[in-house]
Amino acid sequence: MYLDGNLLSQEQSLAYANRAFMNGDAVKVYFFFKNKKVILAEDVYFFLMSSMRKMRMNIPLSFTLEFFTDIFSQAIQNLPFDNGYIKVLAFRKIEDTFSAKTPVHFVYEMVREDSLFQINKNIELDIIKEISVNTHILSNIHTHCPENIYAEIYAQENDLDDVILLNPSKRIARSIYGNLLFLEGNTIKVPKQTEGAYISPLMESFITYVHKNRLAEIEQVEMIAFESQKADEILMISDEKGIFSVNKIRNKEFPNSRFSEMIEKWNLTLV
């Protein structure tokens, strides 16, 4: 294997000899820990299993909930910080013959994030129209997505923190990094997964709490782009980045007082 024209040793080649790097053949999920304790583990685990099945991966018998919680719990105890997330990437090994039985490996990284379960900061969005995201079963999981890469560069070039991605029907799907929640009156509107929204254990935990405690009505919706301007408040929840209040879309600004109060109450239950 060569890198920039230079021959790599066999050991150096190992870093690139996987289908995640060569083919984008991987799925990604995020486990969470707070005060050195893994939380929402079961929800994230089942999302990982579902993502791997959708990608037709050969799930090892060792990939149990107990297996992941044990290795993560041990690793967390050795960290110099208490709060954050665990980025897990499952990928197929490169073999001469590719099949659904190709062995699967996983790597994980522990990332510090002290404000993961509270609103980080205000962000500015706009709608990107020249690309769209799909609405099939692979659109809801974290796998290789060139649309995200394009949109991230677009956001940087236009001094935006994120963008609203539409589906082929010109309806709101999600943002680059996560899902959008629109508060109108006493109703939180969330784009349906069939619209291209991500499956998000973090968001599901929040809206389940809101629903059970009757803080607001939850409505799964199909929304045209213009309807974002009707919202009283907008929240973006990302399993990787955390929680952000959308304070501006084009010329309209949004407050965040009600969402802030809901997030604060929900955060206290995550123990």
What are these regions (language model features)?
Residues 1-74, 99-271:
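Helix-start/capping segments and mature chain N-termini
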Residues 66-97:
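Short, acidic/charged, Gly/Pro-enriched secondary-structure junctions
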